[in-house]
Amino acid sequence: MEIEKTESAEEVFAVPEPDVPWVTIVHNDPVNLMSYVTYVFQSYFGYSKDKATKLMMDVHHKGRAVVSSGSREEMERDVQAMHGYGLWATLQQDRK
């Protein structure tokens, strides 16, 4: 009797790679004003008005924008902060 090899847990679930950076992504929503999103990017991340406006326009027109990158812990903190401001944000590994 021959036994077929099935997929192992390692093959099914992607394990985060420690050396791959993480990113915080802010998604478009129908609630927050563009001026408010720009304000949040300036006040929390310390971005210039021009950079904050560009990121806000990416969120508005493309539906999302990467607003920060770093370790998983840092990105979890940034996502929680965005939620605190009422923005929809997620994190993911930046696999290019």
From Swiss-Prot:
GO biological process: protein catabolic process; proteolysis
Gene3D superfamilies, A to Z: 3.30.1390.10
Coiled coil (UniProt feature): none
InterPro entries from the UniProt entry: ClpS, ClpS_core, Ribosomal_bL12_C/ClpS-like
Origin: domain of life: Bacteria
Pfam families listed in its UniProt record: ClpS
Subunit field text: Binds to the N-terminal domain of the chaperone ClpA.
Family named by the database record: Belongs to the ClpS family.
Function comment: Involved in the modulation of the specificity of the ClpAP-mediated ATP-dependent protein degradation.
Protein name: ATP-dependent Clp protease adapter protein ClpS
Source organism (scientific name): Streptomyces coelicolor (strain ATCC BAA-471 / A3(2) / M145)
Lineage, broadest ranks: Bacteria, Bacillati, Actinomycetota, Actinomycetes, Kitasatosporales
